Curated annotation (Swiss-Prot):
The sliding-clamp-loader consists of 4 large subunits and 1 small subunit. Interacts with the sliding clamp; this interaction allows the sliding-clamp-loader to open the sliding clamp. Part of the replicase complex that includes the DNA polymerase, the polymerase clamp, the clamp loader complex, the single-stranded DNA binding protein, the primase, the helicase and the helicase assembly factor. This is Sliding-clamp-loader large subunit. PANTHER family: REPLICATION FACTOR C / DNA POLYMERASE III GAMMA-TAU SUBUNIT (PTHR11669), REPLICATION FACTOR C SUBUNIT 4 (PTHR11669:SF20). One of its GO terms (biological process) is DNA-templated DNA replication. Belongs to the Tevenvirinae sliding-clamp-loader large subunit family. The keyword DNA-binding applies. The keyword DNA-binding applies. Pfam families: AAA (PF00004), Gp44_C (PF21429), Gp44_lid (PF21328). The lineage of its organism: Viruses, Duplodnaviria, Heunggongvirae, Uroviricota, Caudoviricetes. Keywords: ATP-binding, DNA replication, DNA-binding, Hydrolase, Nucleotide-binding, Viral DNA replication. Disulfide bonds: none annotated. HAMAP family: T4_Clamp_Loader_L. ATP binds at residues 12-15, 24, 53-58, 205. It comes from the Viruses.
Length: 320
């Protein structure tokens, strides 16, 4: 069962997990957060992970939901000293009418220019700790001053074991399937879903974002799979033309591959490497391709630029 926020239309927001049980986490992290929830009240917490999209903000909100807290959510960049002294203090000082625990979530509080706010928050935490908890999310733990870290439970998460990775990807695939069912998105090829998850792991936010992007026509099929995996086949037609010194064919192929130069030159070098004679030809391959790549950004005509490289390779390479 997945949470659905019908007020949202962006899939990432519409299907944001609302509880720790729904969050896809490494086993140790899941147990840690469940233990915090079981106590009914939260300590001051810093959630940090260098990887984006691993669920820091989602976990912070889920913790609040699971203890039925009255939550105030603040973007870290807005949390200047005046905001701490004003709205944050007013919230922390007031008592919940329903007797709920109170939690302030400060998202991405590791941004530059917030040191003064962080210093003021030290005494803030001590003064209001009996009535209000603070959860801070951060990508860079060094962006949080040491005195603030010492007052919080610092939890680094998003470092799964190999066993965790397999389990988490399976859960994410299942979640993607549920989202597709609810959105009436046809999954013509399950490999697309698996490829999206594997490609973006552990950034599940990007995974959902790309699902949103690629499902705009209502179907996930083999065509989408080729885009996701960047599997555009081989450049064997170019290699055959070079082997045969077929200049006319190379001229016809140059426009086809010039559109995605970065992919083409990487693929060309990779496939040529396995087919050219060892020694001088391998050196020539890297010299010519490397020089061409170096000046790619300066070329006014990419098709001509690609054709020039192909002619050089045709003349210089010896094949097995």
């Amino acid at each position: 069962m997945i949470t659905i926020n019908s007020k949202e239309h962006i899939l990432e927001q519409k299907y944001r997990p609302s509880s720790i049980d729904e969050c896809i986490l490494p086993a140790y992290d899941h147990e840690t957060f469940k233990s915090l929830v079981s106590k009914g009240k939260l300590p001051h917490i810093i959630l940090h992970s260098p990887s984006p999209g691993t669920g820091k903000t989602t976990v912070a909100k889920a913790l609040c939901n699971d203890i039925n807290a009255e939550m105030m959510f603040v973007n870290g960049s807005d949390c200047k000293i005046d905001f701490v002294r004003g709205p944050l203090t007013a919230f922390a000082r007031s008592v919940s009418m329903e007797g709920k625990p109170k939690v302030i979530v400060i998202d991405e509080f590791d941004r530059s220019g917030l040191a003064e706010s962080q210093r003021h928050l030290r005494t803030f935490m001590e003064e209001f700790s009996s009535n209000c908890s603070i959860i801070i999310t951060a990508n860079n733990i060094d962006g949080i001053i040491e005195p603030l870290r010492s007052r919080c439970r610092v939890i680094e998460f998003g470092r799964p074991t190999e066993e965790d990775k397999i389990s988490m990807m399976k859960k994410m695939i299942h979640r993607m399937v549920e989202i597709c069912k609810n959105e009436n998105i046809e999954i013509a090829d399950m490999k697309v879903v698996a490829a999206l998850v594997k490609k973006n792991f552990p950034d599940f936010r990007r995974t959902i974002g790309q699902l949103d992007q690629y499902s705009s026509k209502g179907v996930l099929d083999a065509g989408i799979l080729s885009i996701v995996t960047n599997d555009r086949g081989t450049v064997s037609d170019v290699i055959e033309a070079m082997k045969n010194k077929d200049i006319k064919q190379l001229r016809a192929l140059a426009p086809k591959y010039a559109a995605d130069y970065s992919w083409f030159i990487d693929k060309l070098v990779s496939e040529c490497y396995d087919q050219v004679a060892p020694g001088k030809s391998i050196i020539s391959l890297y010299e010519i391709a490397g020089e061409n790549n170096k000046f790619h950004g300066l070329a006014s005509n990419i098709e001509l630029h690609v054709m020039y490289m192909l002619l050089q390779l045709t003349c210089e390479l010896t094949w097995k």
